[in-house]
Design a protein with these regions (language model features):
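Short beta-strand His + acidic residue motifs that chelate non-heme Fe in jelly-roll/DSBH
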Residues: 55-58, 130-143
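Signature of the catalytic double-stranded beta-helix
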Residues: 1-63
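Short, surface-exposed loop and linker segments with low hydrophobicity and enrichment for Pro/Ser/Thr
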Residues: 7-8, 139-148
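Generic hydrophobic, helix-prone segments enriched in Leu/Val/Ile
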Residues: 34, 80, 118, 159-164
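A short hydrophobic beta-strand segment most commonly corresponding to one strand
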Residues: 66-71, 127-131, 144-162
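Active-site or metal-binding loop neighborhoods of secreted/extracellular toxin and effector enzymes
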Residues: 113, 138, 160-164
Length: 164
């Protein structure tokens, strides 16, 4: 990230897509990691967060559902949270366009009373597979250092069986 991109110099927080081919060529351990699960990378990105405003409640865009996140830097003091939202509320949520041009649910209008916490991972220390269509957020609880950086990967052959 430091040697091959200007991402850390950018004031833009949140998602930053990477050149997957270049990334896999320069980080052979990633190739080995994904090969052991027979996964073929479709997209790769890093998420950069320095505050609770950077990765608020959201649902990732389709078509890919199963994603793998790998901690890169400064995940201590951060919490990944997944929520259930009442269907009557979710059905009324307006759509907006994200900065990549995708039509996405605008979950900033969902009242906190309509959220039920389903799962929480604090201080992510190892890779995790998750369903990116479940509403989720990243919350700064007591960050030890900034910025929080996590690599995210989607696959041509989604690891749906790992979601079980």
């Amino acid at each position: 990230i430091v040697e091959h991109t200007d991402i850390l110099k950018s004031s833009i927080r949140g998602w930053h897509f990477l050149d997957s081919v270049h990334l896999l060529k320069t980080v052979p351990d990633l190739v080995k990691f994904f090969a052991q699960y027979k996964l073929y990378v479709r997209d790769s990105a890093v998420t950069i967060a320095t505050s609770n405003n950077d990765l608020p409640l959201h649902m990732d865009t389709l078509p890919v559902v199963a994603k793998i996140n790998i901690p890169v830097l400064n995940t201590q003091g951060w919490s990944n949270r997944w929520y259930s939202i009442e269907s009557s509320v979710l059905d009324t949520v307006p759509y907006t366009q994200d900065r990549f041009g995708n039509k996405v649910e605008d979950l900033k209008y969902v009242p906190e009373s309509a959220l039920t916490l389903l799962a929480e991972v604090n201080n992510m220390t190892q890779p995790m597979v998750f369903n990116s269509r479940i509403p989720h957020s990243v919350v700064q609880v007591d960050a030890v250092a900034l910025p929080r950086i996590v690599a995210s990967f989607t696959f041509f052959n989604e690891p749906l069986e790992m979601l079980q």
